[in-house]
């Protein structure tokens, strides 16, 4: 009998029903009782096992990005970037790397409509020969706050009222009135792009600045951009209401059906590159996650293409248990000093350990597809077969040794130990620049969304005045139009 053959897998299903331990089940309908009317006997092991398993079927949903859909495919390098990075998966045009991608909404629960106004998650896990690289981004290039100290409050303000469980504008506008840097993200959040028609027709962004390092050790800051080959398409508020009322899973269905029909979604990957010596040449901090980099100065460079050509086999195993972490990088890619990115490195792994368990990286969808070895051992639900006698390092009985050193950015950091804001906040300029690129009808939809939100009866005159001041500092005309429709006199 081959004891290694029958590992847990549907590939080894028997033609008849069994318990988890493999014992035969001859009746899956009737409980074991005393007589036909009962009571039920506790010795009905299969009944107890079936109910106990059902009670534990679900895991805690993600605190953000709970509603999502996943698909598999590949990333192919199309342009040579070896002068910028020594990353193996980017080593030459034509190199392909298997990936799994997850799209999501951010704020609402697992079963919420995919048609609601929200930022969308756009996360890609590259299964490279040097380990997993997780590019965990969104469909907008900026975020509401630049410091993770405010992140829990940011999410709570966006989520439903803890008393009524209703998402309310007064809570959102109250909290973010204390974060003027959030206006740039609102220029996306209240814009058409946060009502994408589906996942296939939206952009993706790495959001944060990272670093690319070449073989010589030269580092450049980098931002990642995903551009859909089928173009960007959004819905109006009215269309979103109609679509959500018809099918609350419309984007998941569209993604699944498109792949099943052979109409594979595709995105082009572009990067922006900045020399670290140029960081101080801008009127904003390039490592501030509330800012974008000007494309006229730092143009988009093509790198490769992402193609999703396989649907997942099991939603729970490959979507609910799929775990991303910005801390997962590979040689040739490194973090920047972005404050929010630095804290996400800890927070994502921490939430996965809580949500899935300490051995979540052993799950097939999360495990690297290359040889790997460490002495992280045991723990709840560990299922890795290990037969070593040495579980420590260094050892003269174990040939395992540290890996070859690869280049990482080296720089001298100086400063006082203090809690403070960055010197170049420049909170409003880019929000105004974005607004002025729109056609009048798009500007009007943006203004209407502000008027609707600020008309919430619990939004105070003080809060309205603050937001009109912010909008006016971004674009005087925009602030005046919102103020006039609210019958509020602008302060600027």
UniProtKB/Swiss-Prot annotation:
The active site is at residues 65, 138. Keywords: Cytoplasm, Heme, Hydrogen peroxide, Iron, Metal-binding, Oxidoreductase, Peroxidase, Peroxisome. GO terms for cellular component: cytosol; peroxisomal matrix; plasma membrane. CDD domains: catalase_clade_1 (cd08154). It is an enzyme of class 1 (oxidoreductase). Catalyzes the degradation of hydrogen peroxide (H(2)O(2)) generated by peroxisomal oxidases to water and oxygen, thereby protecting cells from the toxic effects of hydrogen peroxide. Belongs to the catalase family. This is Catalase.
């Amino acid at each position: 009998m081959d004891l290694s053959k029958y590992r847990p897998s549907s590939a080894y299903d028997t033609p008849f029903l069994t318990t988890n331990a493999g014992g035969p089940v001859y009746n899956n309908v009737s409980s074991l009782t005393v007589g036909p009317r009962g009571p039920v006997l506790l010795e009905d092991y299969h009944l107890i096992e079936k109910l106990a398993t059902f009670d534990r079927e679900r895991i805690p949903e993600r605190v953000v990005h709970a509603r999502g859909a996943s698909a598999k495919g590949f990333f192919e390098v199309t342009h040579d970037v070896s002068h910028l990075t020594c990353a193996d998966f980017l080593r030459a045009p034509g190199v392909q790397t298997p990936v799994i991608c997850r799209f999501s909404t951010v704020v609402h629960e697992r079963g919420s409509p995919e048609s609601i106004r929200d930022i969308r998650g756009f996360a890609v896990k590259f299964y490279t020969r040097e380990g997993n690289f997780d590019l965990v981004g969104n469909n907008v290039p900026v975020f509401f706050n630049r410091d993770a100290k405010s992140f829990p409050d940011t999410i709570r303000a966006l989520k439903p009222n803890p008393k009524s469980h209703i998402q309310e504008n007064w809570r959102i506008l109250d909290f973010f009135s204390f974060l003027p840097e959030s206006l740039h993200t609102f220029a996306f959040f209240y814009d058409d792009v946060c009502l994408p028609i589906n996942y296939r027709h939206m952009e993706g962004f790495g959001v944060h600045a990272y670093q690319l390092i070449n073989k010589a050790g030269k580092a450049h800051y980098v931002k990642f951009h995903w551009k859909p080959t089928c173009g960007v398409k959004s819905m109006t508020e009215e269309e979103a209401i109609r679509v959500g009322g018809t099918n609350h899973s419309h984007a998941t269905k569209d993604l699944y059906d498109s792949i099943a029909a052979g109409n594979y979604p595709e995105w082009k990957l572009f990067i922006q590159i900045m020399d670290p010596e140029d960081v101080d040449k801008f009127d904003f901090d390039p490592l501030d996650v509330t800012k974008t980099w000007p494309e006229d100065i730092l143009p988009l460079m093509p790198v490769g293409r992402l193609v999703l050509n396989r649907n997942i086999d099991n939603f729970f195993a490959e979507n609910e248990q799929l775990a991303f972490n910005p801390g997962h990088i590979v040689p040739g890619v490194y973090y920047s000093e972005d404050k929010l990115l630095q804290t996400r490195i800890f927070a994502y792994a921490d939430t996965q350990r809580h949500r899935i368990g300490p051995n979540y990286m052993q799950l097939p969808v999360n495990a690297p597809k290359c040889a790997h070895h460490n002495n992280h051992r045991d723990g709840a639900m560990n299922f890795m077969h290990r037969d070593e006698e040495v579980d420590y390092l260094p050892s003269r009985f174990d040939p395992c040794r540290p890996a070859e050193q690869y280049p990482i950015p080296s720089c001298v950091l100086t400063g006082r130990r203090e809690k403070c804001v960055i010197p170049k906040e420049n909170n409003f300029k880019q929000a105004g620049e974005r607004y002025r690129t729109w056609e009048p009808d798009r500007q009007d939809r943006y203004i209407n969304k502000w008027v609707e939100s600020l008309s919430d009866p619990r939004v105070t005159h003080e809060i309205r005045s603050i937001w009109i001041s912010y909008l006016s500092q971004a674009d005087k005309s925009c602030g005046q139009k919102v103020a006039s429709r609210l019958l509020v006199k602008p302060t600027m």
